[in-house]
């Protein structure tokens, strides 16, 4: 049967189901309050399983534990005068045992048996185990709290497609335990990061989401208009310049976890609205941040997943081992062995290498940009195990401090896992004159057609002129981190409501 034929047959069934449920709701309204709000639960399903799964039936009977629980009815088996139903709440699922003789008169036949899957119930009763050993609640009170007018997805062949999971995330969360677990892990990661940062002496702060000058990264911004001020503003592409202003102000260790917005493409690794954690630490350099990054990931994997070994697809990452460190040019030569490292320092030869692997050279690019493009093409996807890439050219690092021994490069690193960038950190540029010159170069690139080049931020230069102490900064993509921790292969699976075209 074709999908079109299936859809044609399903439509009448669904319409009949909707009509039947609306009629039931109408009857509830006629009989009183159809949406009561006076039931209070005192237990969650996961708590009950944790406390009582290990107890025997006899021990539970002796304990005589009574609980009140509420959630969505996911399954039901009616067997004459008694039935079983499965209730789902935020913690998981628990079975209800519903007997006609244990409920007030009329509740079983006139109410419970007429309720539908997807309805939200509240039940009160004694915790016990069935003959098969399943933890259950023997209900002495059972109430309908919310009438669901639409059926559960799996009653009509589940969610239609992957896109529906993202558009109607509520249905995905109702029917997909893996999705629920993904976002529970995400929440644990966020909490663990905050605890780690506080333990390290950092203060959490918030900086503007709307900015008059979008800075802190090379990206195309979203533009909006502030009516009261009558000025165009930009959704931030990064909080970096504001956070460093705070370091100038005397807050030596700050971090922020929040959204960034970049008006760019959508892919399995990119969403225009995404979550970043940025931190800044005075009197430190990029090497200190490399150590901090290793410790952060080691701590998170252990605290959130219970192990420093993370499985992702066919790969296995061991965060308990020291992470690999390579210079950008070492990585190029490692994954393109025919490359002569000295050729990478010659503009003509570097351009020839780039063109030989299909890179289109822009007129505004210097040697540093060419090197970076070669690295991204030949090496980045091979950086599977946790790896730090260091010695990024100054040309592609407009906010990073130049290396003391080689001013062509900066004291910067990027952190890769599974062939994708997870973090970016560097010793901060605190020379106001050097920063102004780099902003001017960015302006020239923007005028030459690079719409991702940075704007000149005069106020930030003024802040630097007041003195930024030696500082190191780090940004980590939270969404990509969650992808790794949950074995998710598209960023849409770890963002509750990813960006999508409006539905028809």
Swiss-Prot record:
Binds 3 Mg(2+) ions per subunit. One of its GO terms (biological process) is lysyl-tRNA aminoacylation. Gene3D superfamilies: Bira Bifunctional Protein, Domain 2, Nucleic acid-binding proteins. Its cofactor is Mg(2+). It is found in: Cytoplasm. Mg(2+) 2 binds at residue 421. It catalyses: tRNA(Lys) + L-lysine + ATP = L-lysyl-tRNA(Lys) + AMP + diphosphate. Keywords: Aminoacyl-tRNA synthetase, ATP-binding, Cytoplasm, Ligase, Magnesium, Metal-binding, Nucleotide-binding, Protein biosynthesis. Belongs to the class-II aminoacyl-tRNA synthetase family. This is Lysine--tRNA ligase. The gene is lysS.
């Amino acid at each position: 049967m074709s999908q079109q034929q299936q859809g044609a047959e399903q439509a009448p069934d669904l319409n009949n189901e909707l009509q039947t449920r609306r009629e039931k709701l109408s009857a509830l309204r006629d009989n009183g309050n159809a949406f009561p709000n006076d039931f209070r639960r005192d237990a969650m399903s996961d708590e009950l399983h944790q406390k009582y799964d290990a107890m025997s039936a006899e021990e539970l009977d002796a304990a005589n534990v009574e609980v009140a629980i509420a959630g969505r009815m996911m399954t039901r088996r009616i067997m004459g005068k008694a039935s079983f139903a499965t209730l789902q709440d935020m913690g998981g699922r628990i079975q209800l045992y519903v007997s006609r003789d244990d409920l007030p008169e009329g509740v079983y036949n006139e109410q419970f048996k007429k309720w539908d899957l997807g309805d939200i119930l509240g039940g009160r009763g004694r915790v016990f185990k069935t003959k098969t050993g399943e933890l259950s609640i023997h209900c002495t009170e059972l109430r309908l709290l919310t009438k669901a007018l639409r059926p559960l997805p799996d009653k009509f062949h589940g969610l239609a497609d992957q896109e529906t999971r993202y558009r109607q995330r509520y249905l995905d969360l109702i029917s997909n335990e893996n999705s629920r677990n993904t976002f529970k892990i995400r929440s644990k990661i966020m909490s663990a990061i905050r605890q780690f940062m506080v333990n390290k002496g950092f203060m959490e702060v918030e900086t503007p989401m709307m900015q008059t000058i979008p800075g802190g990264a090379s990206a195309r911004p979203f533009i909006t208009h502030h009516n009261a001020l009558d000025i165009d503003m930009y959704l931030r592409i990064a909080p970096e310049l504001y956070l460093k202003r705070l370091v100038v102000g005397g807050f030596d260790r700050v971090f922020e976890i929040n959204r960034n917005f970049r008006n760019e493409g959508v892919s399995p690794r990119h969403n225009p609205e995404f979550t970043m954690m940025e931190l800044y630490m005075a009197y430190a350099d990029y090497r200190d941040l490399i150590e901090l990054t290793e410790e952060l990931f080691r701590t998170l994997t252990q605290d959130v997943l219970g192990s420093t070994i993370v499985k992702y697809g066919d790969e296995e990452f061991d965060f308990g081992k020291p992470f690999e460190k390579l210079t950008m040019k070492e990585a190029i030569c490692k994954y393109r062995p025919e490359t002569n490292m000295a050729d990478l320092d010659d503009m003509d030869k570097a351009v020839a290498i780039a063109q030989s692997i299909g890179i289109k050279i822009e007129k505004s690019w210097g040697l540093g940009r060419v090197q970076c493009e070669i690295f991204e093409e030949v090496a980045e996807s091979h950086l599977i195990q946790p790896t730090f890439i260091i010695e990024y050219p100054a040309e592609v690092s407009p906010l990073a401090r130049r290396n003391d021994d080689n001013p062509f490069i900066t004291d910067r690193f990027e952190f890769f896992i599974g062939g994708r960038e997870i973090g970016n950190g560097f010793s901060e540029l605190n020379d106001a004159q050097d920063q102004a010159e780099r902003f001017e170069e960015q302006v020239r690139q923007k005028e030459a057609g690079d719409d991702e080049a940075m704007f000149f931020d005069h106020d930030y230069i003024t802040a630097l002129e007041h003195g930024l102490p030696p500082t190191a900064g780090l940004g980590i993509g939270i969404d990509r981190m969650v992808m790794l921790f949950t074995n998710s292969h598209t960023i849409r699976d770890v963002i509750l409501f990813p960006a999508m075209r409006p539905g028809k």
